[in-house]
């Protein structure tokens, strides 16, 4: 038996005049996304705190420099479109989730009904 793992190429997302490579989730990225989600929830009705958390979440995926280029901190609360920021945050998460699901689909155990044993190919 031989196991070979080949990580799929990162999904490429075109946005804001650039192409970003979105990786599958790592333990670090999952932990950080969870922290951002907790910050958003903890912000309650404070839209400014929610937007700061969303912006930090975007930076997790595309880097601080790019997040600053698109959503500068100094104008975040006065000029940024909260719907646009939230949509981009969801899009980045969805892209990363798709990458992770592709890896899982390739390597995860199959349902018992889907397993074919060579000595009995009908089962």
Show the residue positions of the predicted features.
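Short acidic, Pro/Gly- and aromatic-enriched capping/linker segments at domain boundaries
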Residues: 1-11
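Short, surface-exposed, charged amphipathic helix/loop patches that serve as local interaction elements
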Residues: 27-123
């Amino acid at each position: 038996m031989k196991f070979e793992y080949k990580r799929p190429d990162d999904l490429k997302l075109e946005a804001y005049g650039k192409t970003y490579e979105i990786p599958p989730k790592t333990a670090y990225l999952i932990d950080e996304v969870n922290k951002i989600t907790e910050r958003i929830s903890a912000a309650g009705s404070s839209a400014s705190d929610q937007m700061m958390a969303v912006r930090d979440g975007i930076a997790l995926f595309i880097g601080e420099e790019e997040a600053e280029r698109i959503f500068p901190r100094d104008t975040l609360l006065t000029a940024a479109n909260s719907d646009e920021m939230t949509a981009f945050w969801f899009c980045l998460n969805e892209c990363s989730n798709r990458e992770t699901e592709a890896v899982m689909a390739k390597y995860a155990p199959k349902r018992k009904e889907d397993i074919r044993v060579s000595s009995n190919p009908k089962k």
